[in-house]
Amino acid sequence: MKKFLALLLSAMMLLALAAGCGENNTKGNNDSDKTISADDIPDEMTSEDGKYEIAFITDVGALKDKSFNQGTFDGVKLYAHANNKTYKYYQPANDAQATDDDRYDAMAAAAQNGAKVIVCAGFMQANALVKAAAEFADVNFVFIDASSPVTDANGNIMNNVAAIAFQEEQCGYLAGYAVVMEGYKALGFAGGGGGDNPACCRYGYGFVQGANDA
């Protein structure tokens, strides 16, 4: 599990570098000297045995949202490609109106389709993830956007769940600092998801502090 997390996070951090390469490589090229970007790897693949070892459960919104979903799934694809693993993404039913049951159904489908690791993006996955992780105890879950260890209904830490939090405030700080250094002084911030979205609020706090420090 630790090895998977280290490689997944490394892949996600390398995403920006890979995406910045000006020349795409031909799919299937095994030349280790060539850089493969996430865009070179298909979003969907066909497993010979119908099983998919790594699953990604999307947050609300489109897979290609240029944000949490896309960044996380690109990391999954890069890891799977580098380690010859099968992968599949699942989008809970009803999109923005998805319920905990919808999210659980997506996780259960992933586990039943052979997933050994299920990566879930977004804090709204919490209730469904706790239920799924308890039922599928032999599957490892990666909870993206969780700021503390995940516990079960009895308050016990779930050993098959790894919690990873984005540090949005650091990204916001750099953005705020950079925009002022570029000469812009009349600033505003409009965060997506409304005023009660913790991730957007953290980004906004960082943005204001970065602009102030500049």
Stretches found by the model and what they are:
Residues 36-49, 54-79, 90-103, 122-125, ...:
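Extracytoplasmic "Venus flytrap"
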Residues 112-123, 142-144:
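Periplasmic-binding protein-like
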Residues 98-114:
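Short, well-structured alpha-helical segments in soluble
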Residues 9, 13-17:
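Hydrophobic core
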